[in-house]
Amino acid sequence: MNKKIAIVGAGFSGAVIANQLAQAGYTVEVFESRPHIAGNCHSERDAETGVMLHVYGPHIFHTDNERAWEFVNRYAEFKPYVNRVKAITKGQVFTLPINLLTINQFFGKTMGPAEAEEFLQSLGDKTIENPTTFEEQALRFVGRELYEAFFKTYTVKQWGLEPSELPASILKRLPVRFNYDDNYFSHKYQGMPAEGYTALVENIINVPGVTVHLNTRFDPDLKSDYEHVFYSGPIDAWFKHAEGRLPYRTLDFETFRATGDYQGNAVINYCDNEKPYTRITEHKHFSPWEKHEKTICYAEYSRQCEEKDIPYYPIRQNREKAMLELYVNKAQNEPNVTFVGRLGTYRYLDMDVTIAEALATSDKFLESARTNARMPAFTIDPMA
């Protein structure tokens, strides 16, 4: 039996699958087109400031998934970290997600939880009974003032689309709290790897039986050299964009350095048109256990992803999902290839979900090998 496995991409998906299959006795080759592992989670020390830099933008690990949390803690020391996001709009600084402090500050009131909830309900547009767009959803639940201050312009900057063009599902879970909790996430486990994400991925992938080829693109014509291929690149690229290019948003970062503390917080969103960027990230605040005299910041801009750009956020509108379905159908007929991860399934995925799915995919492959069953092209439904 050919026990050689090819994995395309050395982000979390590829690294976790490589880890699991190598420990099960397979010989694994990982092909990574970039000069580094860890994908968009890549972190490195900034030479000038010494700050741990989230090279492709901020990543905070947060999860309720016990298996994913236990897995990452096996390969890195995690420091406690709580993401507390601020937002600038109408010339003031507010807390996000919208909470009791945000509501009271915005409206100049001193309401308690029940009063604030009733007040917010009174602001909602009751004429919208079944919201179908992002805009309708926001107007229905928070009213026009909060919608225009915090959601409308920011959404246009982030997605390049009007909120009236986006589905309501983006805002299904209304980010409003009627207390003073300013933790951006509500998950049980939250933290940051002490030595950065690339060190974590390196520890995951650095097991006997795994060889990593950096700066190397995998040729699909070589797939017959392997028992199986796990592909975490863009699904449309595997098929040479035969049905067209699946669109993404990409990010540009304007990097600047300063002495001391630039903004006093890791992330500040800019929700109105006073600034063209969506947010400023000050990286040293992601590692509060470290001390640095200087600081490095990113001003972040979102735009349509072009052919040579790094894809970040899939645009899963109706037209895009129709194109995705064509690729999914092609993938179902591709023997001995499984499509995984954010790009391989054309979905926005948090790190913990990526890791949990990679572990489940590894389990499925090992079970299929034991039972001589066919390994599917997907272990989740990318159309869901």
Model-based region annotation:
Residues F12-S13, P35-I37, T49, L101, ...:
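Short, solvent-exposed loop/turn segments at secondary-structure junctions
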Residues V82, V212-T216, G341:
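Short loop/edge segments at beta-strand edges and connector loops
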Residues R45, E282-A384:
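Conserved flavin/dinucleotide-binding core of flavoenzymes
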Residues A24, T216-L326, Q332:
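Mid-domain catalytic core of redox enzymes
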Residues K3-V30:
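N-terminal Rossmann-like FAD-binding beta1-loop-alpha1 element of flavoenzymes
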Residues T49-D125:
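Dinucleotide-binding Rossmann-like beta1-alpha1 core, especially the glycine-rich loop
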Residues A22-A47:
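Glycine-rich FAD pyrophosphate-binding loop
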Residues K90-H228, S232, F239:
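Active-site/ligand-binding neighborhood in enzyme catalytic cores
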